[in-house]
Amino acid sequence: KNYLLRLGWSHGDKEIFSQEEMIKLFSLKNIGKSSSRLDIEKLKNINNHYIKNTYEKDLLVIIKKSEKTLSKVQEKSILKILPEIKKSSKTIVEIIASLSFIIKERPIKINEDSKKILTLEEKKNIEKIKKMLQTLDTWDTSNIEQLLKDFSISEELKFKDIALPLRAILTGTLSSPSIYNILDCLGKDEVIKRINDIL
């Protein structure tokens, strides 16, 4: 609605209008005379604005129209990570793609690029991390972050050298939301199961 209005009408440089503003500000004298051009990127940017300002529970309702077999556990995980994912998502399709690591069933299929970094040494490190995670009493992003950083320091490893293999095992890819958010939203039991599937 917002984008369609701006195709042939303008009010200065303003791009985003509420329903009330559209009604109040619209005037026939501000309708452009030149042909309108469909700008997909601008449309996506406007869509991102509305996605960011949509409640997570409302987004979940839309997601469930496509993903009809979500369990209650998956829904809970999705609601937990949606605030992070919706910041950069421009379409519902992008959101669902970003949530695929939650929607996938175990065992998670690891893509070829991810397999390359899962060396024997990396798997040994993940095994150590798993044991530390099992002892974590309070499961949240701040405690998970501290645990992983402490491990990287104690083992004299770059953080990416533990984050990438862990991300590969938990999501099957090397690109996903922050590793802390992934661990947090999946929950301790699911994280341990996914690590065990691969190790």
Name the predicted role of every residue range.
Residues 14-17, 38, 54, 58, ...:
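Alpha-helix N-cap and coil->helix boundary residues
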Residues 55-157:
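Small-residue-rich helix-loop
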Residues 11-14, 35, 74-77, 140, ...:
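Short, surface-exposed helix-loop/turn micro-motifs enriched in polar/charged residues
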Residues 1-51, 164-174, 186, 197-198:
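Alpha-helical recognition segments enriched in aromatics with Gly/Pro capping
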Residues 3, 27, 42-46, 62-66, ...:
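A general alpha-helix detector
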Residues 23-31, 70, 110-112, 153-155, ...:
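Short, mixed-charge aromatic SLiMs
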Residues 141-199:
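Charged substrate- and nucleic-acid-binding regions of tRNA-handling and nucleotidyl-transfer enzymes
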